[in-house]
């Protein structure tokens, strides 16, 4: 009976980690053809009025400039110019296809991430008992650690999250989240988030040390500040 009680929270933890990923992946595979068909049939008309990607606009401009340049060169025959127009038309169709695939990718990934969030929210509401057991295990593990190990872990965690080299890690992490949701890479937004998140986390962490750790474990705070200095 005790083994069963101990096994249940572990099974719950494994399901939290793997089940949302498996369900979202299955949903993405099963809905890909439907979303593709819906986008191509319902959204094909307004596409040319909704081109937002800078790279695609630059490609269109390059194609137009190439066409004008070739038309200005009189040595080329009409057949060559006709082939050039056909090639530009094919390139345009390819750009439209790439754009549509990007939008479909965005819809699918955004939907699957919403599903993962709903599943995790449901787990947190329905599995309150298992969460309490897992929380007690974590607290017991942390309680058995020495203050030196705790201070070292806090110092390592803060250096990783808000240290001197943390912006590069934040840039990779935010870029991964952007890609996972299917959004187009935007350097300005990512730079703004990278410059904002560490400051917010640093403020929250200092407040947590001041309000909680000073009251619960003053010796840990002393060791942490000694290591940090």
Swiss-Prot record:
Keywords: Antiport, Chloroplast, Hydrogen ion transport, Ion transport, Membrane, Plastid, Plastid inner membrane, Potassium, Potassium transport, Transmembrane, Transmembrane helix, Transport. It catalyses: K(+)(in) + H(+)(out) = K(+)(out) + H(+)(in). Its main location: plastid. It is a multi-pass membrane protein. GO terms for molecular function: antiporter activity; proton transmembrane transporter activity. It comes from the Eukaryota. Pfam families: CemA. The chain crosses the membrane at residues 7-27, 107-127, 189-209. GO terms for cellular component: chloroplast inner membrane. Signal peptide: none annotated. GO terms for biological process: potassium ion transport. It is found in: Plastid, Chloroplast inner membrane. HAMAP family: CemA_PxcA. Contributes to K(+)/H(+) antiport activity by supporting proton efflux to control proton extrusion and homeostasis in chloroplasts in a light-dependent manner to modulate photosynthesis. Prevents excessive induction of non-photochemical quenching (NPQ) under continuous-light conditions. Indirectly promotes efficient inorganic carbon uptake into chloroplasts. Belongs to the CemA family. This is Potassium/proton antiporter CemA. It comes from Lactuca sativa. The lineage of its organism: Eukaryota, Viridiplantae, Streptophyta, Embryophyta, Tracheophyta. The gene is cemA.
């Amino acid at each position: 009976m005790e083994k069963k009680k101990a096994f249940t929270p572990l099974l719950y933890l494994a399901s939290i980690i793997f089940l949302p990923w498996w369900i979202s992946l299955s949903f993405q595979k099963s809905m890909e053809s439907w979303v593709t068909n819906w986008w191509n049939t319902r959204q094909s008309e307004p596409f040319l009025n909704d081109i937002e990607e800078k790279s695609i606009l630059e490609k269109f401009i390059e194609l137009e400039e190439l066409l004008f340049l070739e038309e200005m060169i009189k040595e080329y025959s009409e057949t060559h110019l006709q082939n050039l127009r056909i090639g530009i038309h094919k390139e345009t169709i390819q750009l439209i296809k790439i754009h549509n695939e990007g939008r479909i990718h965005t819809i699918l990934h955004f939907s699957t991430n919403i599903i993962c969030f709903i599943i995790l929210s449901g787990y947190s509401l329905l599995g309150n008992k298992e969460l309490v057991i897992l929380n007690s295990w974590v607290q017991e593990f942390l309680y058995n650690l020495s203050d030196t190990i705790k201070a070292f872990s806090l110092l390592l965690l803060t250096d990783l999250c808000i240290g001197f080299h943390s912006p590069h890690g934040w840039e990779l992490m935010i870029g991964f989240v952007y890609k996972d949701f299917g959004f187009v890479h935007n350097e300005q937004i990512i730079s703004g988030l990278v410059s904002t998140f560490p400051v917010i986390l640093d403020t929250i962490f200092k407040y947590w040390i001041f309000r909680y750790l000073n009251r619960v474990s003053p010796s840990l705070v002393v060791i942490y500040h000694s290591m940090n200095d």
